[in-house]
Structure formats: C-alpha cells, structure tokens
Amino acid sequence: MQSFRKIWNKPRPDDWMPLARFYYADSALNDIASELDSFDGRRDPDRCNALVTRLRVAQDRVLHIITEMLIHLYPREQDRACRDFRIKFPDEILHDTLPGQLWFGAECLSAGSNIIDHETESDLIRPLAKEVTKQLDILRDLLKNQSLRDPSAYNPVIKENLLKFDKLFAEFEYQYVSAMVPVKSVKEHDSQLDVAVLFSEVLSLALEKDLITQDLIDYCDPSVMIAIPRLGIVWGLLVYSEGALNVDVPAENLSEMFRPFYSLLVKIRNLLRILTPVELTRLETVLCKGETAVPEDSSSKLTMSDFRTNATDEEKAKNNQRVWMCDMPSDSTSSLDSDLRDSASEATSLASSGLTSPSSGSEDNLNRMVDKSDEELDDDVIETASSEENESDSNNENVEMVASSGDSSETESNSKENEEDVDEQATLQALAHETAEQLVAIKKKHEKHSKIIIPMQNEPRTLIDPKNLRSRFRSSEDLVHRLFVCIAGVADQLQTNYSSEIRKVLKIILQPSEVIPVYEVVNAQVANNSTEGEETGVEAQETLPLPAFMGVRWVPDEDCEQCTACSMPFNFVRRRHHCRNCGRIFCHKCSCNSISIPEHGYDRKVRVCNLCYVHRLNPFGCNEQSQASENNTGISSVAEQSSAQATSASS
C-alpha cells in the first residue's frame, strides 16, 4: 500500500513547497546511507571519504528544509528554541554547514564514538545525542508520510514534533560546541560588551573632534578600524577611566584582550596625565592619521634655558643612579647595566624608525621602551619617601667616602672630556654630595628593618612628580613619540592576537541595525474569531516579498486559457506548462528548454520558457532580440494592413 501511495501521490520534483522538497532530499539521504553501508570502507577509503562528504551535505540539506518549515510555521523567534548562546561562539564555528556537522556528530556519539581528547565530555552528552537522533528519525517519518498525503498541510502532531526536535537540537548544539571549543563565560561576555561601549563612545567623540569623518565610516575605510582601538586606549585611560580600561582595579576584572597589557597600561596612563592639551591633540592626530610631520605650535617649543634645565635633571638622575650602584653588589650592578643597555638600544631603534607602527611583538618589548624612565621613577619614589623620614644625625665618614668616590669618578670623566665647563663640574659634585647623604640616611634608616620597601609594579603610584617624569624625555616630541609607539603597539597586538574579538566589537558599533518596516492599518476592524484573524494574517503576508528558497509564484491554470507566447488556445492535446523562472503558462513548443536555477531552489534542470532560456544564456542580447522581434512584428502588421487596403481597393 505504501508503494502505491508513493507512485500515485508522490510530489512533483519541481514543487517549491518545503514538504515536497523534503521528500526528495530525504530519499537522496537514504540512498547515500545505504550505499555507504553496502561496502567495506577499509578496502576503498577514497570512495568512503567521498560518500561521507556527500552524506554530510545531504544531512545539511535536510536540516535546512526542516528549519524552513519551522520558520514558516513559527515566524516569531520567541516561539522557537532560543539560540542567543551563539554570540559566545567563535566566528569560525558559525557557518552554513554547522547543522550538518552537528547531526553527523550526534550519530557518531550515539554509535559509541568519542570526541578526540574530550572523552569525559563525550560521555556526558552521549545520552542527549541519542535522544536527538531518535527524535529526528521520528520526525523524518512523519514528514515523509505527510508529503505523500498533502504537501501543503501540517497536522498538529508534526508541529509538536518539530518544536520538540528544535529544542533538543539547540541544547545539543550548545553542549557539543562547548565541548569542542572554548566558549566565553558570562563575565567575559560582559567585559567584551564593556569594550564595545567604550569603542562606541570613542567613535562618537572622534566624530565630534573631526578625527574621523562619516564618509570613512560609510566606506569602511581600514584607517577607521586601526584608529578606534588606538583612541580607545587613550580615552579609555583618561576620559572614560571608570569603564573597560579601569586600571585601578585588579587585572582579573579587565577584559581578556587588555589583561596581558595591564602593567603597560598603567605606565601609559601615567604618561598621558602629564600631557598638555596641545600634546594630547597632537598624539590623537598622529594615532589617527599616522603622520610623521605634525605642525607644532610655537608655545610648545623648548628654549635654551628649558633645555639646560632638562639636561641638569638628566645628569642628576644619572648621578643618583651612579651613587646608588656604589652600594650594590656586583651582580646587581651588572644586571642593571644590561637592562639599561637593552632599554637604550630599544629606544634608539624606535627613534630611528620614525612615527611608524611597531611590529606586533610581546608585551616585554613594549615594556622595555619605558623601562629606563620607570627605573628612574622608582628611584625618585624611594628618595621622596625616605627624605621625609630622614633623621637629623648622619654618618659623616660614610658621606665623605661615597662623596670621594663620586669625586674620583667625576675627575676621571673630566680628564676624558675636556669640553665640559667648570660650573657644570661643580654642580655635579654638589649633586653627588647631596645624593650620597640621602642614600646613607636611607640605608641607616632601613637597617633596623633589614629591607627596603619598593612599590610594586601594579600598585598605583601616587607619589609621581609630573615635572620629574617629564624631565626624563628630551623634548615634547620625544614624549609624544614614545606614547605613540606604546599605544600603537598595544592596539596592533590586539588586532593580531585577538582579531576575532576586535572584529565582533567593531561589527557591533559599525554595522547598521536592520530596520524592519512597520505597517499601520487605518480604520482596521478587529476580527471577531480566530478564523478571520488568521485570514487577515495570510492576506498581509501575501503582500510581502517571498524569500528566495520559495521560488516564484505560478499563474493559476484557470486564469490562462492560451499560451503566453504564441497565443494558441489550450485543449486536450496542447497542455499547459509553467515556466519555473517567471511562473507564466506556455505550451510545450514555447517551453521546451530546461536549465538549472539555483537561486530559486532548482539545482537540477527544470522547464523554462524560450524567452527566459535566452535571457539566462545571454542576458545582454535578450533586449536586442526582443526589440528586433517587436520591429519585425510591426513591419509584418504594416505589410498586412497595406495588402488588405490594396485588396479592398481592387474590389
């Protein structure tokens, strides 16, 4: 009986309804599965791999048709299973063939296989995989039987099983993907949203300051993608300091993207706080445009007295470091020398490279650029904290010993460098004496506690003097250049190491939201029963454009009594044929061609009219041909009229 039903009630192959398409997709899947089970895959592995690939494609096609049925029956998303968890998945997981891979994975788990290196997770989700495959088999039987009865109707049993399968499949998708790849937690997702909020505020502020134009955003210029993370670091540390880049909290509370750069962000914030408004504007411009030559105001130029003051401060810092190294062990001195040489070489290489974006190295390379200034900063913190607790009495012998060592070193340097002035030598000697006294007082004070307290790297440095911090840079351009290299380095490493997260954040703030038109019905009457309401809904849906997978609307048979092309009337011999491309009715002579139309869901060749066939083969020559045919028709009609007039005149 089932075979007779298949023969007489089998849907047409070119039918666009989901149930009719499901019938043939399920039949193709069964044929591939039976062929795969009929031979030993170890003897012919190439054929086995090809069949497995075809099987997964067929499974994916069946699941897509089932999804179309769910969307057709339940247009609202809240009526179907929730899949908001997909926002936690990586971008490489979300693709069109994901449903087929999930079905294949569920069958493998049901058969007893395990996910590689995830045996424990496989045992946990195996019962759910068995339930999914069982429910899918039941649903396939119901849909196939219904396609043989009436492909245009869905009974309540099918609707109930569709919803049940949708819920089970969504739950299996989350557990299976979570076992395969790392999925973000709620805290990590909230941190990513905080970064999106920060970048959105940065984009608005950049538009107000004319750093980024609306045309660049509309055309998705790459410079916008580069400038937003850079400006986000600057304004996230200065303007929106309580947001995603709040470095006053522990590093664990930051986003996963900025967590490796926590210590470097603290140093960048300290340098940003000493910038003048002119320097900050110059830094923002350089970060956005990458210009090596930025116009400089006359007020920001250094005079000779300022340069001498900066040089004196630098020499003072060097003398402080030299005297401090007199009391350090040889191993510590050698390690400090190596660090200073590394930082100096790094600064030299960066200065020679100009205002260009640094390569995406590690955080240690970026930290090394501010290492020298940071060491001097630690010395000043120790000196300031210790000078407040300095005792009145001091050891004069130790002072003289350290001072004499400083004098001898200065004498040797003066013998080598004859160009130095006498005033500068006296200044340096006085600084050496003063520094030696302070260091001896520090050592005498902390001998009771047997250790010197040095502030940690991640602790907020409240004792930083902006004047001393600024004096460590040669000029204002040097400070801006150092900040540019550090900020651009962090931003470029974000683009390289966290490209997926950055792409998601930029997509949130740059992609325009989809606008759904809302139609208002004026003087509408409320339906009295559910039947009228359902008819109103169907009538409203008729005016909306159909999706591509549903094909085109066919002209009803009763509305056309003759061929659309040749105008010959239809009879018992001359039958009606619909064109699958335009939906109009033609005779057999005017629709004898066949082509495939993938955009309408016809992968195999189907019947089309002659005009659509010519247009598909040569879309540019179709208009010329139609115009030529119209001209020939006009000429023939004129000839017929002239001959008729001649006949009437002769008669």
Swiss-Prot record:
Residues 345-363, 395-412 have a biased composition (Low complexity). PROSITE patterns: ZF_FYVE (PS50178). Residues 373-394 have a biased composition (Acidic residues). Residues 294-425 are annotated as: Disordered. SUPFAM superfamilies: FYVE/PHD zinc finger. GO terms for biological process: negative regulation of epidermal growth factor receptor signaling pathway. Residues 300-310 have a biased composition (Polar residues). InterPro entries: FYVE_LST2, LST-2, Znf_FYVE, Znf_FYVE-rel, Znf_FYVE_PHD, Znf_RING/FYVE/PHD. Zn(2+) 2 binds at C579, C582, C609, C612. A zinc finger (FYVE-type) spans 557-617. Disulfide bonds: none annotated. The keyword Metal-binding applies. The keyword Aminoacyl-tRNA synthetase does not apply. PANTHER family: LATERAL SIGNALING TARGET PROTEIN 2 HOMOLOG. Belongs to the lst-2 family. Negative regulator of epidermal growth factor receptor (EGFR) signaling. This is Lateral signaling target protein 2. It comes from Caenorhabditis briggsae.
